[in-house]
A protein has these predicted regions:
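Catalytic palm active-site di-aspartate
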Residues: 14, 46-48, 62, 76-86, ...
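Short, conserved micro-motifs composed of acidic
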Residues: 127, 199-200, 214-243
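Conserved pre-catalytic core of RNA-dependent polymerases
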Residues: 1-156, 160, 582, 642, ...
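Extended C-terminal regions of large enzymes
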Residues: 315, 328-586, 668, 676, ...
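Short, conserved catalytic/metal-binding micro-motifs enriched in Asp/Glu and His
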Residues: 14, 82, 99, 112, ...
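Conserved, non-catalytic sequence blocks in retroelement Pol enzymes and Pol-derived host proteins
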Residues: 17-24, 47-57, 69-72, 84-89, ...
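Basic, alpha-helical interaction scaffolds
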Residues: 236-307, 358-365
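Short Cys/His-based metal-binding microdomains
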Residues: 593-649
């Protein structure tokens, strides 16, 4: 497979191994056993191929080290190591010794040896195979076991670097950090050029042991902190002001950072849209393209970087223009809702940005050390570190210089205010409480917390100042005086003194009640936050409300009608058409005349009455005759009479089980619509031809999706006729 670099050079190609099924299954079994212990043996600095770890943590660590060194005005260097053909060059003996070093037993090691002993391969190029040749190094890309073997081998290098006292890292608070990894991508944080020299010497020795060779043409270095204006280029390395790694462009230049991480991707999305606009996609087809191809280009960036509001607006405009080719037909707040409420399940970008940021709470309170965790503790040091998230704070009272983490604090506070249905324990916490201030500033006294004085009732308002102070001192309060104690008690407003306190909630102070549910950010993922946030923003569509009003239906009936869109047909165009009917976004002459697109609003068929949706599909004399013929057609097919009201025609028979009648009704409306566009009256003979054609289409899709049995059951009446 060719990489994005210059295709004229062989080193820019990578091989994907085609492995026989038996070997692949056996390899997968061994891989499954190794993955069970990876979290224990692989340091949290490695974010690649270890379950539960996120690549964005490595990217965020690099950004935070850059910010920290700049704020503290301390020198630093980022070294981005690129290994030449890393997966293809690792030495097998070294790999097996690494497994032994980490305590894997002889049985598992023998299995790995079995996969690599007497290994031969050939190259398939343009359908032509070379003769087989013996392999002597490397792990096969395409083998389930390969990534785990590689990161175990790479961990030996990381352990060596972390243990070397002469190779210094960047100190953030009291913690020293030297590196982050993502599979074979290694980024090092060092304070000076001497450490870079030591690392390069170590890497040369590591090459001899492991076979992994540094690619000096792609390895980059970057001056950071107080050295960021340095223009020197020592040691023959590529020194850059702007480096791309881990899917993110790292630079101190804000303009370049926005352009390369956001607006360049916007150009790619525009190009993709131009290509897909030529394909004549259905509405649901476009939704699929948006969710599976266009937005994934940005979702990772949203989770790692601060996203400008202007960019979100531009991206929304591009996406909705692609979807509707003009003015929105469904309100955006309805479009992001679930199909059962008349929505399209589109991703709400603003909500996704917030949910992906809130998902960092789970990572903050998980185990392990990382530069980004140390950085946020440093930022919140005056407020007790991450303890602040448990408090009833106001972001305005917290001087947090990082926009990324300030937004996290703001959105977490907003989430609790919006969704908490009863006061949480945070309202009772004294410290950093926006309602408890001295000299118009919130308070945080670590010595009080060490003495167990955390909640308002711990200030003992059932006693006077002197009695309560003496009681607190007897329970361990140190390094405080009576005036400070009295000041804290006086700062508590009367309405907070009467709040009910459930001290057991201190076991998980971040948790709050949302109706009958408990929301605990420590276990919540991006998906959970998104569902919660979008539930408050999403609205029921206008089409949903109109169906209720026009036909006097209950919410459950309208929901059922919209959900049947997913099963009415396997063909996206038919599904999309039925959705448009239900959503009242089909443009008949009556609607076109109202917006000034046509002068004559009369029916295309009868030229007498205004062409409303109801008239076109049911009330017109031409359409009415077609439905009579349709009922005869259905009787001949099924032997059953069917009555068709306006509701039945527009939304289908809600109690129909097999789905064939509803499918025929939808295709019949499709036939009426296409006849209108051709200025021809709907005709039962032409409809039968359409059904025969659609039968072939549905059968083809069923074969492709391996759903022939379901297809046969639905179409039995038609097949037997």
């Amino acid at each position: 497979m060719k990489r994005k670099e210059d295709r004229n050079y062989l080193e820019n190609c990578k091989a994907i191994s085609l492995i026989n099924a038996d070997a692949k299954h056996a390899s997968k079994v061994i891989a499954g056993r190794i993955t069970k212990v990876l979290q224990e043996i692989i340091h949290t600095n490695q974010t690649g191929y270890v379950k539960g770890r996120f690549t964005g943590e490595a990217a965020r660590s690099i950004i935070d080290v850059m910010e920290y060194t700049k704020q503290q005005n301390i020198p630093g260097i980022l070294l981005f190591i690129d290994f030449e053909k890393a997966f293809d060059s690792i030495d097998w003996n070294f790999m097996l010794k690494c497994l032994d070093a980490f305590g894997f037993g002889p049985t598992l090691i023998r299995w790995v040896e079995t996969f690599y002993n007497d290994l031969t391969s050939c190259v398939l190029n343009n359908g032509i195979c070379t003769s087989y040749f013996e392999l002597q190094r490397g792990v096969r890309q395409g083998d389930p076991l390969s990534p785990y073997l590689f990161i175990i081998a790479a961990e030996i290098l990381a352990v060596t670097i972390r243990s070397r006292q002469d190779i210094q890292g960047i100190m953030i608070g009291q913690e020293e950090f030297k590196l982050v990894q993502y599979a074979d991508d290694l980024t090092l944080f060092v304070p000076n050029i001497e450490c870079v020299e030591l690392i390069l010497q170590l890497l040369d020795r590591f090459t001899i042991c492991s076979g992994l060779k540094v690619n000096h043409t792609k390895t980059e270095a970057m001056w950071i902190g107080s050295c960021r204006q340095n223009t020197a280029t020592p040691l023959g390395l590529r020194w850059s002001k702007c480096v791309k790694a881990l899917g993110i462009v790292f630079t101190y230049n804000d303009t370049d950072q926005l352009q390369k991480n956001f607006y360049d991707k916007l150009k790619d999305i525009r190009i993709q849209i131009r290509l897909w606009n030529c394909r004549g996609l259905s509405l649901f087809g476009k939704v699929t393209i948006i969710k599976s191809l266009l937005l994934p280009k940005m979702l990772y960036v949203f989770s790692v970087l601060t996203t400008p509001e202007e960019f979100i607006k531009q991206l929304n405009t591009i996406i909705y223009n692609f979807l509707w080719k003009g003015t929105d037909k469904i309100a955006r707040k309805a479009a992001v809702n679930d199909l059962k409420y008349g929505g399209l399940n589109l991703i709400d970008l603003e909500t996704y940005v917030k949910s992906s940021r809130l998902a960092w709470l789970n990572r903050i309170f998980s185990g392990g050390s990382s530069p980004w965790k140390a950085y946020i503790k440093y930022l919140l040091e005056d407020f007790g570190g991450v303890f602040l998230f448990s408090c009833n704070y106001d972001v305005k009272d917290c001087k947090v210089t990082s926009t990324f983490y300030r937004e996290l604090l703001q959105w977490w506070a907003d989430l609790r205010i919006t969704f908490s249905t009863r006061p949480s324990i945070s309202y009772n916490i004294i410290w950093n409480n926006k309602d408890i201030k001295i000299d118009n500033k919130t308070i945080y006294y670590s010595n009080y917390i060490k003495a167990g004085i955390l909640l308002i009732n711990h200030l003992q308002f059932n006693k006077n100042n002197i009695e309560s102070f003496n009681s607190a001192k007897s329970k361990g309060l140190k390094h405080s005086n009576f005036l400070v104690w009295s000041g804290v008690r006086a700062a508590v407003p009367a309405h907070l003194k009467s709040l009910d306190v459930i001290e057991s909630e201190l076991e998980c102070p971040l948790e709050f009640h949302c109706g009958e549910k408990k929301i605990n950010p420590i276990v919540c993922k991006n998906k959970h936050f998104y569902e919660l946030l979008v539930s408050d923003k999403a609205k029921v569509s206008r089409g949903f409300a109109k169906l209720k009003e026009d036909f006097g239906l209950a919410d459950s009936a309208v929901t059922k009608a919209f959900l049947k869109v997913k099963t009415v047909s396997s063909e996206m165009f038919i599904r999309s058409f039925q959705f448009k009917i239900l959503s009242d976004i089909t443009f008949t002459n009556s609607r076109l005349a109202k917006i000034g697109y046509v002068q004559d609003d009369s029916c295309t068929f009868c030229r007498v009455s205004p062409e409303t949706v109801n008239h076109l599909f049911y009330e017109c004399t031409h359409t009415n005759q077609f439905w009579k013929d349709f009922k005869n057609f259905w009787f001949a097919l099924s032997g059953k009479h069917v009555e068709l009201s306006l509701q039945d025609v527009m939304i289908g028979k809600l109690d129909e089980v097999s789905g064939l009648l509803n499918y025929f009704l939808t295709v019949a409306k499709w036939h009426i619509w296409t006849s209108r566009k051709r200025c021809l009256s709907p005709d039962i003979a032409a409809f039968k031809e359409v059904i025969n054609m659609k039968y072939k289409t549905e059968k083809y899709i069923a074969v492709k999706n391996n759903t022939q049995r379901k297809f046969q059951a639905r179409w039995k009446l038609f097949i037997d006729s």
